[in-house]
Amino acid sequence: MKKMLGKLLITAGILVFFAVVVKDVFAAGLGFINGTEADSASASPRDIDSMVIESDSKDVRIIAEERSDISAGISGDSGKLFVTENKRKLELTVKEKEFQFLNGFNRSTLIVRLPYDYKGDLAVRTSSGDVSVAGNDHLALSGLNAVSASGNTSVTDVRIQDLKVKASSGDVSISNTVSKTAGIDLASGDANLVHVSGSLDVKMTSGDFNAVLKKVTGPVSVTLTSGDANVSLPQNGSFAVNALSASGDVSSPYSFADKGHKEQHHITGTQGSGRHPIDIKTDSGDLAIR
C-alpha cells in the first residue's frame, strides 16, 4: 500500500512538472508579441508623444528625473523586454521568461526613467503586478491611464491633465497630484488620496475611500457600494456637498458657511458660492466630511 501511494505521488509530481513545462513552452511559442526583444530601451522625449507599457506579472516602476532620454530596463532575471517605436509611440512589453518555476520567488521589475521634459501620454496595463509613478514634483503629463487586474497602484508628485486608474483587485494611492480630471474605478480595494487637486470621479464596489482634497476645481463624485468614506475638504473654496449613506452614519465636523441639511444618513452644506458639486454616496458604510 505504501509503495503504491509513493508511486502515485511520484506520478503526480511528474505530471505537475510537465504541465508547468508545457505551459511555459506554449506561452513562449504561441504568445504573439509586437516588438524586438532587448535588454534595455532608450528614446528621445522629442521623438515620443505617447508611451504604452504592458506587463503580465511584473511590477512597473516609473521614475521622473533630470535626464535627456527615456530609459527602460528590467531588474531581476525572470522577465523579458520587448520594444517597439513607431510613429512617435513607444511600446514596452514585459513577459515572463520560460521555466520560471525553477527560479523560485525571484521577481523582476520593469523600471522606466522619464526625463522631466516628457509631456506626452502614458498608459500602463498589468495583469498581476504593482504600478508606481513618481513624478518628483517635476513631471507633467497630458494623460496617465493605469489599468491593473491584480496589484496596487501608486501615483505621487505629478501634474496630469487627465488621470484614469482602473483595478479589479488592489489598493490605489495618489498623493501630491494635480489633475484637471481624475477617475478611479476600483472593484475591490481601498483608495487613499492625499493632497490631491482637481476634479474627481470615483466608483468603488468594495473598499474604503480616504481623501484629503487640497483644492477643488471641478465636480467631485464618489460612489461606493460597500465601504466607508472619509473626506477632508479644503478650508477655502466654492463647493456644495451632498453626502448620503443608505445604510450607515454620516457625520461632518466641517464648518460649512451654510449647512443646509443634517441628519443621521444625509448631510448637505455649502462653502463659498457652491460652484463645484461634491457628491459622496455609499450603499453600505459610514461617511465623514472633515
Swiss-Prot record:
* Residue ranges, annotated region (Disordered): 257-290
Cross-referenced InterPro entries:
Toastrack_DUF4097
* Changes seen on gene knockout: Up-regulates expression of liaI which in turn induces the liaRS two-component regulatory system.
Q: Which residues form a coiled coil?
A: none
Output the superkingdom of the source species: Bacteria
* Induction remarks: Induced, via the two-component regulatory system LiaS/LiaR, by antibiotics (vancomycin, bacitracin, nisin and ramoplanin), cationic antimicrobial peptides (human LL-37 and porcine PG-1), Triton X-100 and severe secretion stress.
Signal sequence residues: 1-27
Bias-annotated ranges (Basic and acidic residues): 276-290
Q: Does the keyword Signal apply?
A: yes
Keyword annotations for this protein? Signal, Stress response
Protein name as catalogued: Protein LiaG
